[in-house]
C-alpha cells in the first residue's frame, strides 16, 4: 500500500446508501460500504443522535465506538415523528440505491419506512432490515444488544475460563450481523445489475451468531459434547495455549501432527516425542492434554520469549505474542504495511487503520467522521428544500 494511491475508482462509487442506524451492527455495514466508495447518509435522531456518540469520550471528547464506525459518512438529523421530517427522509430514500435500518422491531414500519411501503414505489431499492432475532419466532419483538445475543445463542457458554463464562472482548454478534449485511448488499447490487430487481433482506444478529457457532453445534449434535470453556486453549487441538518462558509467555498452536513433529524435533530437540504412543496424533494429544501441556510448559521455560519465538518461526511452528492494545498500537506489522492514516473529526484529526480489504490500485476511503447533523442543510437543499424552509424546520425542532 502506498500513500500515493487515491480513492478514485473504488468499486461502489455512484452508489448511495441511506442508513437509519445506531450502535454497531448497521453502522459497521454502512461504514464498509462507504470504505468501498459508496455515499452513505446517516439518519440520526434529534438531540443526541446515534446513542453510540455518547458511549464514552475517549477520543478527544468523542466516543471510541462512534469514530470507529462512522467515518466516510454524512449526517442528517431529523425528527422522523414529524410529517415534514418523515417526508424529507422518504424523498431522500427515493434517491438511494440501498436503505439500511436497525431500529427497534416495528419502528420502521410505524414510520412508513418498511420495506413493503418503500419498494412499492421503488422496486429497484435494496432494503436491509437488521434485527436482533429476526422477523418471526418467540423472540422477534425483543430488543437485542450484543451481550444478550451472545448469551442467548450460547456463545458465552463456550467463551471464557472453566470458572467463568464471558462475552467476547469485541461485540461479535453485532459485527457478525454487520458483515453479513455488507455481503448481502454487495450480492444484491450485483444481482440488480443483471436483472434490475431490488431486494428485501433480513439480517438477524441471532442468525449471524449461530452461523459462527457451527463447530460447537456439530460437536453437540453428533457427539453430545458441550464445548468446554478453556481460556486460550482449543477444545479439539493440543498443544494450543499460552506457555511460560523465562521472561513471559508465548502462544503456541500446533494444528496437525506434522506441526507436533516440528515442535518436538526442531524446537525442543526431543525427537522421541514425535511418535510417542500417547502423543503421536492430535486425538491422542487431546486425550492426554494435561500431560502434553505440562511437558510443553516445562520445555518452553528453558527459553527467553524472543528466542523461543524466533526458533518456532524458523521451524514453521505457529506462535504469537500475547499482546495488549498498547503493544498493538506499536506493532511493527502495521507500520511495515503502511496501515495508519489520518481521519478528520470535529475535535481534530485522529489516527485510523485502513480497512482490511486492500486493492492494489486504489485505496479505501478514510474521510472524516461527521458531527451530528453536519450535512443536514446540504442534504435537504439537494432535495429541493429552500433555505427558508430549512430554517423553519429547524426552528420547529424538525431538523438539527
Each PLM stretch: what is its role?
Residues 313-334:
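Conserved PLP cofactor-binding pocket of PLP-dependent enzymes
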Residues 47, 132-134, 205-210, 247-249, ...:
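Glycine-rich beta-alpha junction loops
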Residues 1-16, 228, 244, 327-400:
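Terminal low-complexity tails and localization/encapsulation signals of metabolic enzymes
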Residues 178-199, 211-223, 265-270, 274:
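Oxidoreductase and adenylate-handling cofactor-binding alpha/beta cores
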Residues 1-194, 371, 377-400:
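N-terminal helix-loop segment corresponding to the beta1-alpha1 unit
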Residues 238-315, 319:
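Aromatic-enriched alpha-helical interface/lid elements that frame and gate functional surfaces
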Residues 135, 162-170, 193-209, 228-235, ...:
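Conserved Rossmann-fold dehydrogenase catalytic segment
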Residues 49-51, 221-227:
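Short Pro/Gly-enriched beta-strand edge/turn motifs at strand-loop
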